[in-house]
Amino acid sequence: MTSYKALGLVNTKDLFAKAVKGGYAIPAYNFNNLEQLQAIIQACVETRSPVILQVSSGARKYANATLLRNMARGAVEYAHELGVDIPIVLHLDHGDSLELCIDCIESGFSSVMIDGSALPYDENVALSRKVCEYAHARADYVTVEGELGVLAGVEDDVVAEKSHYTMPDEVEDFVKKTGVDSLAISIGTSHGRAKFTPEQCTRNADGVLIPPPLRFDILAEIEKRIPGFPIVLHGASSVPVEYVREVERYGGNLPDSVGIPEEQLRKAAKSAVCKVNIDSDGRLAMTAAIRRVLTTKVDEFDPRKYLGPARDELKKLYMHKNKEVLGSAGRA
């Protein structure tokens, strides 16, 4: 059994309180390998941003729980080596059972998400409450994220064909009965790189898909019901057109790719939304760089020669997110 404090990690309690008050959001970047972790820490150190290292159950299986725990410890030491002790959270993304959440907590996670959003309301409440009871009883308080509403799309093992918006009249009851520390809501974001169908979008003069706007009216109503409570946005990648085109230029095929416009994320970050999840953008940035290297240098076979540029592109992207989108730069 490992305490997250022994790894140098923090939970989200104070970070979220400061973010809500300060009108910015903390980045939650998914990772499952060394290069992704290097890019995240470098970007957040250089922008002086707190960060949530986010791991899905699939990523945890891929990376191995023991290696992952030590990667998190290494991330803290690496940031210190780079000269800035930024706050770092290790968070389970989309935990689907009490057992998984307990396993992650006991292996050093400082925050977990229990996703019972696909369950009937009462079952979601009961499951989320059990996770909170365990996490909050620890000597080192572990924070818990719950979810109301369902996001469409695919993210590792999480699959949903249709979105179901969060119902504002449920949030106060849910938060009170479960004891969750933050709440993921559904206001129009989706998982994956094709967040909307072409039929849901319009097109600009260049033929680029323009998605429908987020439901800020739902967010505003939720904020009225639970003022100051930390809100989380999943599926918040912007799916930059330049990365999609780069992937396709070098042999990929990513039809109908569309994400959440950054101006809408900026607006959300100034509200009670204090955690914004970004995964697909990172995948696109790395894949574009890797395809470019392997296509233009056909004799290259040293992984460092294509994973290095992928890491550098990811760092560049995340520095932009921290500084220009989420407002987390300078908040460490």
Swiss-Prot record:
Binding site for D-glyceraldehyde 3-phosphate: 56
InterPro entries hit by this protein: Aldolase_TIM (IPR013785), Class_II_FBP_aldolase (IPR050246), FBA_II (IPR000771), Fruc_bis_ald_class-2 (IPR011289)
Active site: 93
Gene that produces this protein: fba
Swiss-Prot/TrEMBL catalytic activity: beta-D-fructose 1,6-bisphosphate = D-glyceraldehyde 3-phosphate + dihydroxyacetone phosphate
Cited function: Catalyzes the aldol condensation of dihydroxyacetone phosphate (DHAP or glycerone-phosphate) with glyceraldehyde 3-phosphate (G3P) to form fructose 1,6-bisphosphate (FBP) in gluconeogenesis and the reverse reaction in glycolysis.
Keywords per UniProt: Glycolysis, Lyase, Metal-binding, Zinc
Record's cofactor remark: Binds 2 Zn(2+) ions per subunit. One is catalytic and the other provides a structural contribution.
Binding residue positions for dihydroxyacetone phosphate: 192, 235-237, 277-280
Source organism superkingdom: Bacteria
Sequence positions that bind Zn(2+) 1: 94, 191, 234
Quaternary structure, from the entry: Homodimer.
Name of this protein: Fructose-bisphosphate aldolase
Required cofactor names: Zn(2+)
GO BP term, example: glycolytic process
Protein family: Belongs to the class II fructose-bisphosphate aldolase family.
